[in-house]
């Protein structure tokens, strides 16, 4: 019966387009939640989520809040990462860092390195940016009190303190054993050879 009424209404609207069709719109008025209703809603959500409450989720988010490294404070892992990338590329190589940066880097190792005591050893005299002898890239090095030097990955330390987005993690850091190294050829220019030049010449 309701279907027939809708069909009649739509036909009459098509026949006489000037005729206005009255429609009642049900408006949902927001109703204030009492404390008991809110508690019941949270408890049902908690049961649906397998026992996780919002308070636990908030606690997890707080871990990604501001972090102090020495006198410097970082709100996100990306901001922390960007700071160290800029520092690494703009600081002159083989030059001791200043006291401010020394405190930041020391705190980075203490809070983010997997084995800080082993890395620090008998104490850190200074930090430097050096060209890594094997990788030929700029790296942070710490110089201990006994003048031994060791490099460390600021990226891994940052990721330990505040987890980095997946696309910024080190290759192979996801624990699957893949990644790292140069890999073998492939891609746009193929595997071996293919150096400079254009076409093959006879």
Swiss-Prot record:
Tissue expression profile of the protein: Expressed in leaves, flowers and embryos at globular stage.
Disulfide bonds: none
Broad class of the protein's primary localization: nucleus
Compartments, record wording: Nucleus
GO aspect biological process, one term: regulation of cell division
Source taxon at top rank: Eukaryota
Protein name: Protein EMBRYO DEFECTIVE 514
Biological source species: Arabidopsis thaliana (Mouse-ear cress)
Gene: EMB514
């Amino acid at each position: 019966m309701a279907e027939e009424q809708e069909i009649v209404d739509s036909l009459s609207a098509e026949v006489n387009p000037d005729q206005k069709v009255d429609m009642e719109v049900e408006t949902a008025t927001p109703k204030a939640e009492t404390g008991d209703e809110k508690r019941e809603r949270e408890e049902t959500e908690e049961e649906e989520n397998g026992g996780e409450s919002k308070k636990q989720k908030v606690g997890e988010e707080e871990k990604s809040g501001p972090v102090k490294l020495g006198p410097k404070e970082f709100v996100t892992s990306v901001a922390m990462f960007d700071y160290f990338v800029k520092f690494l590329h703009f600081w002159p190589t083989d030059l001791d860092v200043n006291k401010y940066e020394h405190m930041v880097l020391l705190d980075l190792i203490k809070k983010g390195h997997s084995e800080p005591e082993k890395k620090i050893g008998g104490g850190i005299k200074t930090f430097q940016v050096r060209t890594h002898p094997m990788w030929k890239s700029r790296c942070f090095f710490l110089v201990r009190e006994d003048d031994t030097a060791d490099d460390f990955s600021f990226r891994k330390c940052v990721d330990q303190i505040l987890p980095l987005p997946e696309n910024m993690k080190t290759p192979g850091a996801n624990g699957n054993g893949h990644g790292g190294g140069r890999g073998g050829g492939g891609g746009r220019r193929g595997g071996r050879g293919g150096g400079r030049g254009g076409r093959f010449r006879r």
